[in-house]
């Protein structure tokens, strides 16, 4: 290009549209600045459907059976531009669905197939998702036909379910209800590597995988199929499998069922040298129209496809459910070889002709079946082998285990069963769905007021009631829709024993509420009483500040039992930090203020909502252990804006005592008048948060602060109430 003839930048207004043309950004200048972007992602401005769009309502209009039939027909309609292996797209769609759902991790509930994020970077370009762009394009005519009635998120997952059915495999149902996002998520930490497939970069010590990651390398869904760091060791591969599947919430039996069941279908693709493969979708040229991995080897498709670099089918009948995977796994000895692409894999020693697989394009041509290092782990690991041999001898048990594990895989990030849509939702409740009994009572406004009076007359303080309600509700994670106040699992193990919940105080509060419950003429759940107690305390605190308010309350929560609660499964919800209660379990490599932002994002809060809640919780004395850090008021228990007023007081100078503790000294006398944590001070330090804090510190916004605090409070209290459409705004009248 002749640079002398290149036009100047046409953006006179200074707007820029790509990193190359954006100049030096704030992030370039201050790479360690607090990232608040995750609190404003998925803004309505990016959603083409508009605020009024109701996916559940649209889905109710769907001809579900017709949709499934169209998917079945598509699977047998091989397209010249991307032909189906063995004449059936079923295995391809299973991989697409598995890789959509399989990014889920229990550590923070992020990932999974619940948002259709496989359409966007980085997932659409991960090496492990190679050529799945073609699977999504194959589905486009169906999405185009059914339009708003089926989300991409649901369709990507449903397609694999239909594929298993169509190939004779076992499924136990399907729940729809996944709503699409419209740009990549910014809150998910996929790792810190700058390149794909970099080996053990995310490990430390004795192969300890970084939390909350659930894949061994950047760009993989789970494990390296060639073995750890590409070394073909089945025993060491078993360690990686157990850890990564465990971080997705799967036990050994579920893991074996999924691997064996998934590899009953289809084949791996590594027909030639991977140098023939072009860039991933995000790096592909504009004329590729979002398709990546263009392949110049042979025809570039069919038997010439290059994806993972591994090559071959696992069974002799790769489009039919059977016990062939275990038959071959235990029926032969396996020798190490390499695929045409140079990847380590295993072939059977002297296989019978009946155990050879058909060629992807010509069923009359037979090719060797293969096993991957991770497949052989199911034979060489002692625990996996026991399960595998049991499944081999009991095909019906294997089929049932696979169907249940597959359903769990597809639905693990969807939260409670109340969110499921469609005619195929199983009647059975599964413990991983965190079931909560439904309630059959209603409360009149008068009864609610009577209950609030009883709670406020019980001797419990505003701080105790607010802290307990917050502890119950704030376990909610919008990532996988788990936690929350419904179920009152704060009464049960493990939550009742969590340090952050101050077990002695919690036991006292619950005892008082249970005593009130026992004296009532009608059934009211403890879950409702916990939330109502917090709401009553907020109303009392607002009244003390001069505002008569009604905190909206919607009864209808149930009380879960210990038998309905997976103790190990709930352990991952224990907060290691909760800035709203000024709690930090220990010092971490991530700052307390970053952990606050992460917590706020999981609660689905905006920056203003987070700010209002922090100010209110400090005023109400809701700190862990009753500490005075950040309690910038002489009227604890009164819902004032004192936190913001005193934080922004230029008469106070702040000095560090240690990493997470600061003293505020009077500039004139040098006297220590306040103490604070990093979470407190970030609302005066960060320019964005300070701007919001200034709004709430204004003399004319005392009422606005109360109103905004209540709105954010109710949002958290009702975060898991999927039966409620909208929270009513607090009715605020200044006294």
From Swiss-Prot:
Keyword Metal-binding annotated: yes
Domain of life according to the entry: Bacteria
InterPro entries membership: Catalase_peroxidase, Haem_peroxidase, Haem_peroxidase_sf, Peroxidases_AS, Peroxidases_heam-ligand_BS
CDD domains per record: catalase_peroxidase_1 (cd00649), catalase_peroxidase_2 (cd08200)
Biased composition (Polar residues): 15-27
UniProt remark on cofactor binding: Binds 1 heme b (iron(II)-protoporphyrin IX) group per dimer.
Keywords for this protein: Heme, Hydrogen peroxide, Iron, Metal-binding, Oxidoreductase, Peroxidase
Cross-link annotation Tryptophyl-tyrosyl-methioninium (Trp-Tyr) (with M-248), location: 98-222
Cofactor(s) recorded in Swiss-Prot or TrEMBL: heme b
The UniProt record lists the keyword Metal-binding: yes
Cross-link Tryptophyl-tyrosyl-methioninium (Tyr-Met) (with W-98) placement: 222-248
Pfam short name (any one): peroxidase
Residue(s) at site: Transition state stabilizer: 95
NCBIfam families: cat_per_HPI (TIGR00198), PRK15061.1 (NF011635)
Family: Belongs to the peroxidase family. Peroxidase/catalase subfamily.
Function: Bifunctional enzyme with both catalase and broad-spectrum peroxidase activity.
The protein's name in its UniProt record: Catalase-peroxidase
Annotated organism of origin: Halalkalibacterium halodurans (strain ATCC BAA-125 / DSM 18197 / FERM 7344 / JCM 9153 / C-125)
Encoding gene, per UniProt annotation: katG
């Amino acid at each position: 290009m002749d640079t002398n003839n290149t036009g100047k930048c046409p953006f006179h207004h200074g707007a820029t549209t790509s990193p190359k043309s954006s100049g030096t950004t704030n992030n370039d200048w201050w790479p360690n600045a607090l990232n608040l972007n995750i609190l404003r992602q998925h803004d309505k401005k990016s959603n083409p459907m508009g605020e009024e769009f109701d996916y559940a309502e649209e889905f109710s209009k769907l001809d579900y059976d017709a949709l499934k039939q169209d998917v079945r027909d598509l699977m047998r309609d091989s397209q010249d531009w991307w032909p189906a292996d063995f004449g059936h797209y079923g295995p391809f769609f299973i991989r697409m669905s598995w890789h959509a759902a399989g990014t889920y991790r229990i550590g923070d509930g992020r990932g999974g197939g619940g948002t259709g994020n496989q359409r966007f970077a980085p997932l659409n370009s991960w090496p492990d998702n190679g050529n799945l762009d073609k699977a999504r394009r194959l589905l486009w005519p169906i999405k185009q036909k059914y339009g708003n009635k089926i989300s991409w998120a649901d369709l990507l997952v449903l397609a694999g379910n239909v594929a298993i059915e169509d190939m004779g495999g076992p499924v136990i149902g399907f729940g729809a209800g996944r709503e699409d996002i419209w740009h990549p998520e910014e809150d998910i930490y996929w790792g810190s590597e700058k390149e794909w497939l970099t080996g053990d970069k995310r490990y430390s010590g004795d192969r300890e995988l970084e939390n909350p990651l659930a894949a061994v390398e950047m760009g993989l869904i789970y494990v390296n199929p060639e073995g750890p760091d590409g070394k073909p060791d089945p025993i060491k591969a078993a360690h990686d499998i157990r850890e990564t599947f465990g971080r997705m919430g799967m036990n050994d039996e579920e893991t074996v069922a999924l691997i064996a069941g998934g590899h009953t279908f289809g084949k791996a693709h590594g027909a030639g040298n991977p140098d023939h493969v072009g860039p991933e979708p995000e790096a592909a040229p504009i004329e590729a129209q979002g398709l990546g991995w263009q392949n110049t080897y042979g025809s570039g498709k069919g038997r010439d496809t290059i994806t993972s670099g591994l090559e071959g089918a696992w069974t002799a009948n790769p489009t039919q459910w059977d016990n062939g995977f275990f038959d071959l796994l235990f029926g032969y000895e396996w020798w190490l070889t390499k695929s045409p692409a140079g990847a380590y894999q295993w072939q059977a020693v002297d296989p019978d002709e009946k155990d050879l697989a058909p060629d992807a394009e010509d069923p009359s041509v037979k090719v060797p079946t293969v096993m991957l290092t991770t497949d052989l782990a199911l034979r060489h690991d002692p625990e996996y082998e026991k399960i595998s041999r049991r499944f081999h001898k009991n095909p019906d048990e294997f089929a049932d285990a696979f169907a249940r594990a597959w359903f769990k895989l597809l639905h693990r990030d969807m939260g409670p069963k109340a969110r499921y849509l469609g005619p195929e939702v199983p009647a059975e409740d599964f413990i991983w769905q965190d079931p909560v009994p439904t309630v059959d009572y209603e409360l009149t406004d008068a009864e609610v007021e009577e209950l609030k009076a009883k709670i406020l007359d019980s001797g419990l303080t505003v701080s105790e009631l607010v802290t307990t309600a917050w502890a119950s509700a704030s376990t909610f994670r919008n990532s996988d829709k788990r936690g929350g106040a419904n179920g009152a699992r704060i009464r049960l193990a493990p939550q009742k024993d969590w340090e952050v919940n101050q077990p002695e105080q919690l036991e006292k509060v619950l005892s008082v509420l249970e005593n009130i419950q026992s004296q009532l003429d009608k059934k009211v759940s403890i879950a409702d009483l916990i939330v109502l107690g917090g709401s009553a305390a907020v109303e009392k605190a607002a009244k003390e500040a001069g505002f008569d308010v009604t905190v909206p309350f919607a009864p209808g929560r149930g009380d879960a039992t210990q038998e309905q609660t997976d103790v190990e499964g709930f352990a991952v919800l224990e907060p290691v930090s909760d800035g709203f209660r000024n709690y930090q379990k220990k010092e971490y490599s991530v700052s307390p203020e970053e952990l606050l932002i992460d917590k706020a994002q999981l609660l689905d809060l905006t920056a203003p909502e987070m700010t209002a809640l922090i100010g209110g919780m400090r005023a109400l004395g809701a700190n862990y252990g009753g500490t005075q850090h950040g309690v910038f008021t002489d009227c604890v228990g009164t819902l004032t804006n004192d936190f913001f007023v005193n934080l922004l007081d230029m008469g106070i100078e702040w000095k560090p005592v240690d990493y997470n503790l600061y003293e505020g000294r009077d500039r004139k006398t040098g006297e220590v008048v306040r103490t604070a944590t990093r979470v407190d001070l970030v609302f005066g330090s960060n320019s964005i948060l300070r701007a919001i804090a200034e709004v709430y510190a204004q003399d004319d916004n005392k009422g606005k602060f109360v109103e905004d605090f209540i709105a954010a409070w109710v949002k958290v209290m009702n975060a898991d109430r999927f039966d409620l459409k909208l929270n009513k705004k607090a009715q605020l009248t200044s006294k």
